[in-house]
Each structure stands twice: as structure tokens, then as C-alpha cells.
């Protein structure tokens, strides 16, 4: 599997297998994400996408296979260790702290990603580097003006942007985005697409998304997962023209005519 010319893979997966009893969730998965590219992972519900992301992030262990971040094997590392090595993740369901302000969430994320241990927020706010880092990640997604706003007062789209900002804490090399447009309205979706597009070149992104318009607007490359196995990987144009992909996921011409 090739990566973009002149770039090295920030993430390399080889031979990843994961079974739950008789159910094989991932089957010999191989995938590469180049530094700075947006690589979309698509497939029908139950295809194994989230299971694969959990293996990359470290919340589940594969039965076999290799996971390399910037050339280094990380399969033996814990989630906190992988985060410190350069992995950020946003989740399908928002996991921000609703009882805190936007900046408090960002400071906590910066402290956690940089290995800091703060029992209370006051010591964290006494560290200028943490506060500066927190404001930087908020500005990267355009919500620095909401820094002092309680999270409970944010609109849904703003919460999703905050979640993206928190995933950027610690300046990761790889960002795992699990349906960042979930639950968003048309305007919020377009805004999120623009924010993610501006991250291109700064961080490698593995994007899981059911919104095909967003996928084909954002992705440099697309990998299609069906029943835990990769059935195709290529440019958006190559994937859109792939008959097997259309039949398995996007819908065949016969289905469209039915």
C-alpha cells in the first residue's frame, strides 16, 4: 500500500486481527496514513471501523499484527503512553466535561497529554505554558472567543469543535477522528469540514465518517472496510469508481434504479 510521494507514514498497520469468539472484527488489516494527509476509513455499520480505531488507540489489543507510529512499534504501549507518543482522538459521543468552562477543559487536556499530573485546576492555571497551549488548541478550531463559556452553554456544533480541540492537545502526529460530524446540522457540518481541512499538512488524520460528502471533500485517500477486511484503498476518485465498493457500501447502480 503506497503513501503520498515524498512523505513517510505516520501510522502503519500490518496484519491486524481481532476476534470476539466466532466474530472476526478485523481481518488482516493493513493501512498507512502519511504525515499530514487526511485518510478516510469508511464502511457499513458493523464493518469493524471503531474496533480498528480502538486497537490503534490502545483501548483494545489486537490478537495479532503490528501498529507503528512514526516507524516505532506501539502495540505494547498503554493508552496514556500512546497519547504521549503522539496520538490524539475524538470520539463518536462527545466526552467533554460539561460542568467546566471551555478553557478549563483545554487546560486539563493539555496537562494530561503532556504528562502533567494536576489534582486541581488551580495548579494547572499557574503554569503559563499549559494555559498558552490550551488557548492555542482552541484557536486552531476557532473557539478561543468562547474560552470562559461553560460547556453546558455551548451549542452542539461548538461542543464537537471543543472535542476536536482537546484531541489536538499536546500537538499530536496522528489524529483519530470518529464521526466528528455526528449529530451536526448542515451549517455545523460545513464549518467542521472547513476546520478539518485547515489541519491538512499539520497532522496525519484517520477520519471515520458516514457523511460521504464530507469524506470525498476532505480525504486525500480512502480505505474501505467491509466485515473487518479492507476491500479497497485509493484516491476518492478511485474509490468512487470501484464497483466492489459501490456494491458493498455506496450502493450499486441496480440498487439505485430499484
Residue ranges and their predicted role:
Residues 2-258:
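Glycine-rich phosphate-binding loops of nucleotide-dependent enzymes
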Amino acid at each position: 500500500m503506497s503513501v503520498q510521494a515524498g512523505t513517510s507514514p505516520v501510522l502503519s498497520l500490518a496484519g491486524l486481527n481481532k476476534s470476539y469468539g466466532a466474530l472476526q472484527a478485523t481481518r488482516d488489516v493493513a493501512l498507512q496514513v502519511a504525515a499530514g494527509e487526511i485518510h478516510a476509513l469508511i464502511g457499513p455499520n458493523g464493518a469493524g471501523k471503531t474496533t480498528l480505531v480502538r486497537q490503534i488507540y490502545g483501548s483494545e489489543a489486537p490478537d495479532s499484527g503490528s501498529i507503528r507510529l512514526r516507524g516505532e512499534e506501539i502495540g505494547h504501549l498503554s493508552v496514556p503512553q500512546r497519547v504521549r507518543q503522539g496520538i490524539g482522538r475524538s470520539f463518536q459521543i462527545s466526552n467533554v466535561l460539561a460542568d467546566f468552562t471551555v478553557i478549563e477543559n483545554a487546560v486539563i487536556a493539555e496537562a494530561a497529554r503532556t504528562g502533567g499530573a494536576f489534582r486541581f485546576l488551580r495548579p494547572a492555571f499557574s503554569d503559563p505554558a499549559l494555559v498558552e497551549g490550551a488557548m492555542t488548541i482552541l484557536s486552531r478550531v476557532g473557539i478561543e472567543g468562547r474560552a470562559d463559556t461553560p460547556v453546558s452553554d455551548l451549542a452542539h456544533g461548538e461542543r464537537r469543535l471543543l472535542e476536536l480541540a482537546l484531541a489536538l492537545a499536546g500537538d499530536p502526529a496522528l489524529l483519530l477522528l470518529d464521526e466528528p460530524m455526528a449529530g451536526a446540522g448542515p451549517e455545523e457540518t460545513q464549518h467542521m469540514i472547513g476546520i478539518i481541512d485547515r489541519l491538512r499538512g499539520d497532522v496525519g488524520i484517520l477520519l471515520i465518517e458516514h457523511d460521504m460528502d464530507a469524506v470525498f471533500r476532505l480525504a486525500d485517500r480512502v480505505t474501505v472496510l467491509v466485515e473487518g477486511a479492507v476491500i479497497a484503498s485509493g484516491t476518492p476518485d478511485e474509490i468512487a469508481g470501484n464497483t466492489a465498493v459501490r456494491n458493498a457500501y455506496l450502493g450499486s447502480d441496480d440498487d439505485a434504479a430499484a
